[in-house]
Amino acid sequence: VYTETLDDDTMEILLQQLLENVKLISSTEEEFMYASGATYQEVPNLESDYKNYSTAEKVAMLQDLEKKTLAVSPKIVKVGYCQYSETSQKVQIMNSKGLDLSRSYSYTTTIVGPLAAEGDQTAMGFAGDINPFFQQIEKDRIIKEATEAALAQLGAGFVKTGKYPVSC
């Protein structure tokens, strides 16, 4: 059972779903629950540095990303998608035997989607980067990948139906 909102209204529904799920279990294996006190591998938290940068710096980065994407080729006629987002998450595992483990992490996601055009044909390309460090966002790589993906589709056509030799 999964929910993104845990409140009194959803609690009854979640419990009913859980009971229905339990009825579906056909395994005869005995379940084992880990207790607290056991030794577990340390998994470090990963904290992004995006909080150290102003909104103006982030907007400037996106404007630069769009400008450089458009400059790749005159066939790149517009950037249909240029996005930056920040994510912070915490994963926690708890049970009734005292186990309580957690890990938190945060990162940025940057995506660009250029539109290429030639004659009456258009094509979109997309590429992105997931990175915990703002200054390490791989703008040049995503520009290259996204524009190459869009440009590579131009001039493509359909193959006439028929029998063709296949080499292995």
Question: Where do the protein language model's features map onto the residues?
Answer:
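Active-site bordering "gate/hinge" segments
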Residues: V1-C168
